[in-house]
Amino acid sequence: MRIPLGTVLWEETAFRGVLQAALGRVMPGGPAVAVTSCIFGLWHIGPTAAALRINGLAGGPGKMLAGVSAGVAATAAGGVLLSWLRTRSGSLVAPILLHVATNSMGALAAWVITRPER
């Protein structure tokens, strides 16, 4: 439950609620979303590297760099969508719900893949 729920409220409040709003006061909306999303992607370097190591996918510095880079890019792209939802809805509720759904699907997929066969 920590992955789907424990990080979402904190991350959405920090990134879309505080950072995006603060940057939106000093720069246009598009650049504020881009900066927020890039920082959101970079925030996930540690968890992505840990997931690659735990699942035996690191395979050396080159593979680790490629995997982390892909994870950061995907998370930053997701951040753009979450930021768009924040802007479009005027609320944190929509990005929180999408973030919970995304994290929950990832946790469910990991559980299905790693559970013992019956």
What are these regions (language model features)?
Residues M1-R118:
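Transmembrane helix-loop-helix hairpins at the membrane interface
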